[in-house]
């Protein structure tokens, strides 16, 4: 791992993400690119004449000063930190910055509720995930002093298009020193599969991925509940969910 992107907005949650990113950067000897979206409305930008260009420059400088102060953290010492400022709140730019700097990982904070759907669907996080080919690590909940995940759950529908995501998850688990647990959530209704059919599908997927790993089939009422309950069962520290291109994560929770 050579470079990590972490978008920040000065919130407590984004600082938690920054701490995790710093911990990973230090452990992996990676460069940390800290991205701040300095949002300026058309009025502030001067397009409607409500504010002078001098005032625009002043506001930009204030934002840059606040960003600089935010990065004055003891846990960022001895890490190569490159601040990046964008003047528009366009979340696709996160993916563009990641591509420009050949990032191996994007780390983001989330203020989502307890459920997985509330964290992802329609959120800023999903906007980034949907436009990024780079793995996105979402940090939520309590402060994380030492990011050292022991158990990493990868939940998938085991469709062929998820093969690249599994390979990235496997590589990430190896980098983090985590044990990777693969799980298929089997739910009632139209999506229900017999054990034999499910294992046939999974076996075909693993052959395609050229990965020799065990997969657990976990039954639950919804995919979301299944992922959470399985993760609790094994004491997971990290959950990985593949996205399918522009559809983002919504397909994963359909009907749940």
Positions of predicted regions on the chain:
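A short acidic, glycine-rich active-site loop
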Residues: 52-65
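Structural motif
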Residues: 35, 84-86, 119, 139, ...
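Gly/Ser-rich helix-loop-strand patches that form or flank binding pockets
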Residues: 3, 23, 27, 94-143, ...
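Structural beta-alpha unit
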Residues: 13, 72-106, 207-253
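Intrinsically disordered, low-complexity Ser/Thr-rich linker and spacer segments
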Residues: 143-150
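Small/aliphatic-rich secondary-structure junction motif
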Residues: 1-51, 150-216, 236
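Well-ordered alpha-helical segments embedded in enzymatic catalytic cores
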Residues: 66, 93, 165-168, 226
